[in-house]
């Protein structure tokens, strides 16, 4: 047990899917996993372990922002022996080549947060996904006939930015999606010798102001989860 996770030793699989919303974690467990059991619920940050096509997999919420997700990712890795974390969440698009409902695989994550500079002695740290995990996710998407975009995300410290001109800079540098956690999770994984990947669904477009409906989000969210789960199986065979 830790101050933030009340699961017993051995409660988590070596691979954990992590949405921000704990209710999405519950949905994933109930919809996609067999024999799913709740293993933690402190602060209502729900976590479950079950099986997917016979493979033991866990799912747990991580909350909003780098500080929250970093706590859970670190404790899962160092206290529960988790080897791989797949963040599954939503993001906003700033690039006109990206459309709502697109699925993005985040090879890297830029950020305005200073957490990785703190851990990297005030130098820039290239926050990147594990290549094998990204490769497996791309292949899983191809196998299911789902188009994905692969590239850089931007992990923002502020949801309500005071500097909207920054979106112009993001677009110039080819950022595919804006979210709030990937750079932190990649930094934690690097520090503690684990592996991580972020897969996001575009829920809204910052430029066009388009938004997905609740029904549309659910459908595309399911595609993202299927990619993540199938990538775990493919990763086992690589």
UniProtKB/Swiss-Prot annotation:
GO terms for cellular component: cytosol. It holds the Pfam family PNP_UDP_1. One of its GO terms (biological process) is purine nucleoside catabolic process. The record marks 217 as: Important for catalytic activity. A purine D-ribonucleoside binds at residues 4, 179-181, 203-204. Phosphate binds at residues 20, 24, 43, 87-90. Keywords: Glycosyltransferase, Transferase. Its EC number is 2.4.2.1. Transmembrane segments: none annotated. It is an enzyme of class 2 (transferase). The keyword Ligase does not apply. It catalyses: a purine D-ribonucleoside + phosphate = a purine nucleobase + alpha-D-ribose 1-phosphate; a purine 2'-deoxy-D-ribonucleoside + phosphate = a purine nucleobase + 2-deoxy-alpha-D-ribose 1-phosphate. GO terms for molecular function: purine-nucleoside phosphorylase activity. PROSITE patterns: PNP_UDP_1 (PS01232). The active site is at 204 (proton donor). Catalyzes the reversible phosphorolytic breakdown of the N-glycosidic bond in the beta-(deoxy)ribonucleoside molecules, with the formation of the corresponding free purine bases and pentose-1-phosphate. Homohexamer; trimer of homodimers. NCBIfam families: deoD (TIGR00107), PRK05819.1 (NF004489), PRK13374.1 (NF009914). Belongs to the PNP/UDP phosphorylase family. This is Purine nucleoside phosphorylase DeoD-type. The gene is deoD.
């Amino acid at each position: 047990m830790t101050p933030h996770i009340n699961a017993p030793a051995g409660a988590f699989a070596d691979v954990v899917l992590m949405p921000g919303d704990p209710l999405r974690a519950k949905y994933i467990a109930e919809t996609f996993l067999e024999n799913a059991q709740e293993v933690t619920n402190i602060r209502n940050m729900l976590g479950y372990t079950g099986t997917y096509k016979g493979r033991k997999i866990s799912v747990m919420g991580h909350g909003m922002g780098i500080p929250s997700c970093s706590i859970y990712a670190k404790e899962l890795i160092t206290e529960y022996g988790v080897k791989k974390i797949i963040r599954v969440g939503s993001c906003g698009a700033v690039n006109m080549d990206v459309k709502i409902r697109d699925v993005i695989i985040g090879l890297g994550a830029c950020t305005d947060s200073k957490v990785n500079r703190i851990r990297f002695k005030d130098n820039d740290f290239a926050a990147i996904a594990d290549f094998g995990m990204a490769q497996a996710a791309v292949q899983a998407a191809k196998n299911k006939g789902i188009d994905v975009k692969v590239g850089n995300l931007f992990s923002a410290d502020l949801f309500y930015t005071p500097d909207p001109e920054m979106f112009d800079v993001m677009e110039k540098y080819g950022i595919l999606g804006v979210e709030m956690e990937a750079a932190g999770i990649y930094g934690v994984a690097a520090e503690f010798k684990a592996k991580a990947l972020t897969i996001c669904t575009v829920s809204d477009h910052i430029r066009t102001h388009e938004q997905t409906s609740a029904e549309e989000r659910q459908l595309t969210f399911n595609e993202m989860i299927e990619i993540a789960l199938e990538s775990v199986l493919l990763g086992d065979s690589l």
